[in-house]
Amino acid sequence: MGGAKPRSWVVQAVVFGLVLAACGGTSVEVSDFCESVVETEAAISSGPGDDVAVWAGQLTETLTELEQLAPDEVAGAVGTITGILLPAIESGSEEALFAGLESTEFGEAAAVVDGYMTDECGWQVADVTAVDYQFETDLGGLEAGYNGFAFENAGTEMHEMALIRFNDDTTETIEELFELPEEEAFSKITMPGASFAAPGDSDTLFVDLEPGRYAIVCFLPVGATPDNIEALESGELQGPPHFSQGMLEEFTVAG
């Protein structure tokens, strides 16, 4: 974890940053929809692992359920999102998936869903602002359950908010964790979600948090801008990760 960010982590960051946000609601229908979106993001974040077919099947199932549960106010936007993602998943092409995720149509539809979720779901939402190179936020007082993170990039570079949960038996601080070999470090954490935003953009991430120790981290390399997104995604862009410049913060979620 101490070196330049691997391509797989960039891929997850971009996907999380572009995939619609979720929430919990004031009616059964809204609540079901919001929780379905959380499940969808969790399926995406898990990645294909060793069995792409199983992952694709699970993600297809969650997206189909999401479309069925969508309230009338966002049915069109959700239909646009699933109409972009499902064919790309079926094709098995990462290029097709990213072309869809980066399309104007997807971005506009995701923004509609974001707005609906923020207004209707009724979960606690913490504001997180990214600057070069730190997070400006107060994450004290978070409690277990569904929570939102309204992520805004006020910096000049691209930033992400990677949400990390320390395993219950992990004793290292986030700084100490990054001194360990990458494989050992990753064995001590899980990653419930992430948001990604270009300068001036924002994204809202909703996750179901368990009690425990957490941190938010930016893994993107120094120098990451919208002008070199292809080099970033391919892993060609080299530079110290933003967390090495101070872009990381620990917090605790109460039970």
PLM feature segments, named:
Residues 24-26:
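Bacterial signal peptide processing site
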Residues 32, 36-86:
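Alpha-helical segments in soluble extracytoplasmic regions
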Residues 19-22:
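C-terminal motif of bacterial Sec signal peptides marking the signal peptidase cleavage site
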Residues 30-49, 93-125:
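C-terminal amphipathic alpha-helix
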Residues 160-164:
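Beta-strand signatures of extracellular beta-sandwich domains
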Residues 151-155:
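Asparagine-centered strand-capping/turn motif at beta-strand->loop junctions
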Residues 122-125, 130-134, 142-144, 156-158, ...:
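Extracellular/periplasmic metallocenter environments
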Residues 2-13:
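Bacterial N-terminal signal peptides that target proteins for export
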